[in-house]
């Protein structure tokens, strides 16, 4: 009968048991392994390979959890190469598939419900199955290994790595604000003592280092500043110190200024270190996004979204306006045009575009960034688990970002009709390079110019020649005449316009009266026609009764006519 081997991992090492294959065909396996005597009768210890240290135990167990075959496990399984038609019971089906791919092994991995019952019994009665292993030692080693394994999982969690980028970019922004404030305070404070140095040295770090090395202004000529400044700058500072117009300060003032200068130097060095750290982390976590928009813009996008996965789930339209939420909601509320870009506006490709092309390039860049983000967040770059080789190199990981950036640059070059600037060059809003002020700028100190004075000594001041006044004719009378004429003309024109308005109103009233008279004449003609018709009808009727009735109707008609006339008069 073919044997059955059972592979078990413990906190102390890897264990290989041997049993009869009929064990899997029994229906009451769980009841037989409930006691230590029963499980010892079914299983025999084949081999026990201990872990050398806690680090080795963590490495081996971590590989088993991920379903990988470690070198130590491969060495243990080499002892079973001579076994024919044997089976190997494992707890993880993924691990069984990895073992089945090993060359030279004819074992058949098994993982089902019955093997789970066997592993449960082994864990319960492990001290009785392995001689020399105490229960206290097993519990202590299991506790330490579980803590180490938990730390290992948290350390390599991609969600936790995003936190490093979010905190780093936030700290970088805070450092920039603090450095700007401290550097301005140092220049204003030390400027009372040596104001000319602020115009010569523009770099904040060099300014603070000069203060720490020189101290009082009188020590400038005897201090060597070659390790901080170039020769021409050093010479300019020493020349300006000799004729400086600054006030004197005490040693206590200088001590406080030096303490602040030390803060500027320390923060500047830490800021450089943090910037390099952020660039390295962005290249490792989101290489395609970094190639498209840069380290700082990419880090701000991740920080604004909360994590790399949240940003990868966002569509391109959201990535395009991320950071401009206030402007978006204000535009929707007022029914105006929505913004075209948010944080992505600071990318170099968008900065090189001009006018309406900025919106087009921002839309293209957001679309490519959305694809690159999904590749960065969801791709499994490591191929070791599949047995295909080592990790993918950085160039292959960022290949999508490089090709996408080249496509956008080609499109931008076509619509702009000009060559693009190389990467790393600061670009202003107009698409041109922003010429930052140089670190070293030589400016001559201003000296007193005696030639500019009007008097060289005690010479009396020259009298200013008085110019003769020319008699000019008065033009007041002419102005008055012209004013009166113009006023008379304006009055006459106003009177004429008023007369014309009155005549027009009179003509309108006469026309209205004529219309009313015509209407009255038409009504009178209609009445006369009606009366003539009534007279004809009365002449036709000859009977007295009819004449009497007709008479009454005529009297009634006369009364009605009188009433109508009264109404018309009223």
Swiss-Prot record:
Molecular function GO labels: snoRNA binding; snRNA binding
GO aspect biological process, one term: endonucleolytic cleavage to generate mature 5'-end of SSU-rRNA from (SSU-rRNA, 5.8S rRNA, LSU-rRNA)
Keywords attached to this entry: Nucleus, Ribonucleoprotein, Ribosome biogenesis, rRNA processing
UniProt cross-references to Pfam families, sorted A to Z: Nop, NOP5NT
Regions of compositional bias (Basic and acidic residues) in chain numbering: 475-484, 492-518, 528-539
Domain spans labelled Nop: 285-417
Disulfide bridges in this chain: none
Ranges where the record places region Disordered: 451-470, 475-570
Family listed: Belongs to the NOP5/NOP56 family.
PANTHER family to which the protein is assigned, alphabetical: NUCLEOLAR PROTEIN 5 NUCLEOLAR PROTEIN NOP5 NOP58, NUCLEOLAR PROTEIN 58
Functional summary from the UniProt entry: Required for pre-18S rRNA processing. May bind microtubules.
Protein name (database record): Nucleolar protein 58
Organism: Sclerotinia sclerotiorum (strain ATCC 18683 / 1980 / Ss-1) (White mold)
Lineage, highest ranks first: Eukaryota, Fungi, Dikarya, Ascomycota, Pezizomycotina
């Amino acid at each position: 009968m073919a044997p059955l081997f059972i592979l078990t991992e413990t906190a102390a090492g890897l264990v290989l048991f041997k049993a009869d294959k009929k064990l899997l065909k029994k229906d009451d396996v769980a009841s037989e392994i409930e006691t230590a005597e029963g499980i010892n009768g079914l299983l025999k210890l084949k081999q026990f390979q201990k872990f050398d240290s806690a680090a080795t135990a963590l490495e081996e167990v971590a590989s088993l959890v991920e379903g990988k075959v470690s070198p130590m496990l491969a060495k243990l399984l080499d002892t079973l190469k001579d076994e024919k038609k044997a089976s190997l019971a494992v707890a993880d089906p993924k691990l069984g598939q990895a073992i089945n791919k090993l060359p030279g092994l004819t074992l058949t991995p098994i993982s089902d419900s019955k093997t789970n019952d066997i592993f449960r019994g082994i864990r319960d009665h492990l001290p009785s199955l392995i001689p020399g292993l105490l229960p206290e030692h097993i519990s202590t080693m299991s506790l330490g290994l579980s803590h180490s394994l938990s730390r290992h999982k948290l350390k390599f969690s991609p969600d936790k790595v995003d936190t490093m980028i979010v905190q780093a970019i936030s700290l970088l922004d805070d450092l920039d604000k603090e450095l700007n404030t401290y550097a301005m305070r140092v220049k204003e404070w030390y400027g009372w003592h040596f104001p000319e140095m602020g115009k010569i040295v523009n770099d904040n770090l060099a300014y603070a280092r000069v203060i720490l090395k020189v101290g009082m202004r009188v020590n400038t000529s005897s201090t060597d500043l070659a390790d901080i400044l170039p020769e021409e700058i050093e010479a300019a500072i020493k020349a300006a110190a000799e004729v400086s117009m600054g006030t004197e300060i005490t040693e206590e003032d200088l001590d406080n200024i030096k303490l602040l200068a030390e803060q500027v130097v320390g923060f500047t060095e830490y800021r450089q270190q943090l910037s390099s750290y952020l660039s390295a982390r962005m290249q490792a976590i989101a290489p395609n996004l970094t190639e498209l928009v840069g380290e700082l813009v990419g880090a701000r996008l991740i920080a604004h979204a909360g994590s790399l996965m949240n940003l990868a789930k966002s569509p391109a339209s959201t990535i395009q306006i991320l950071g401009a939420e206030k402007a978006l909601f204000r535009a929707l509320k007022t029914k105006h045009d929505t913004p075209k870009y948010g944080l992505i506006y600071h990318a170099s490709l968008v900065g090189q575009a001009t006018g309406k092309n900025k919106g087009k390039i921002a839309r293209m860049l957001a679309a490519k960034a959305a694809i690159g983000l999904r590749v960065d967040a969801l791709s499994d770059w490591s191929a070791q688990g599949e047995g295909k080789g080592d990790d993918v190199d950085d160039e292959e990981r960022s290949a999508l970002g490089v090709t996408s950036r080249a496509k956008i640059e080609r499109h931008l070059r076509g619509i702009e009709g000009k060559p693009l600037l190389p990467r790393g060059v600061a670009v202003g809003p107009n698409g041109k390079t922003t010429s930052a002020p140089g670190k070293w700028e030589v400016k001559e100190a201003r000296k007193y110019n005696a030639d500019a004075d009007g008097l060289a000594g005690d010479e009396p001041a020259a009298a200013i020649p008085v110019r003769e006044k020319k008699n000019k004719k008065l033009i007041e009378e002419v102005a008055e005449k012209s004013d009166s004429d113009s006023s008379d003309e304006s009055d006459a024109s106003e009177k004429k316009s008023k007369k014309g308005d009155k005549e027009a109103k009179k003509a309108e009233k006469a026309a209205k009266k004529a219309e009313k008279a015509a209407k009255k004449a038409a009504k009178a003609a209609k009445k006369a026609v009606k009366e003539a018709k009534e007279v004809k009808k009365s002449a036709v009727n000859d009977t007295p009764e009819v004449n009497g009735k007709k008479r009454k109707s005529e009297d009634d008609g006369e009364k009605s006519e009188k009433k109508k006339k009264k109404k018309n008069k009223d």
